[in-house]
Amino acid sequence: MVRAGGWAPQDEVLGETGCGTLRRQMKQHLAVSAIGNDRTGMVHDLTRVISDCGGSISESRMATLGNEFAMLVLVSGNWHSLAKLESELARLGESTGLTLHMKRTEPRAPRTELLPYSIDVVCLDQAGIVAGLSGFCASRGIDIAEVSTRCYPAAHTGAQMFAVQMIINVPKRLQLAHLREEFMDYCDAQNLDAILEPVKS
């Protein structure tokens, strides 16, 4: 039976359940952090669970930190896949001792008002290097997208060195020539060898 206006009773049912079905089929995202004692097979354990649940790794960062191994992973999948993954990862944490945190999220929208730049810094190891660089960026409204650091002995002297790599997003409102000059002045004052250049696409 069709009611006035061409509306049928089943349309209401299809509308309600259809929206729910559509939401479950749409790609969703889960951010996962995991840390545990470094051992062979950790990456396989985590990625196998993601794959078995129907998830797909969109982005990831993994590193050894002391005797620990840390992983940051952005997983995409439909509602059912991610709901299953949340349960399976909780089981994995209990069985392996991994400390896991999970949070539903959305991919970041394109930010056309920002220009990606890379920072490379090398210096003698000393306290406060990252704090100083991040403070320089924060005071100018510059977003830090990625940070990577490491310590290593200098090849000839054996002196302990410190290296920093950053990806920053510079607002287009800033004058790049002036920013570069300020940055180099800051690094000279701190005895940092530094490079600031656009990210090559």
Stretches with model-predicted labels:
Residues 11-25:
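Short, Lys/Arg-enriched N-terminal segments with co-localized hydrophobic residues
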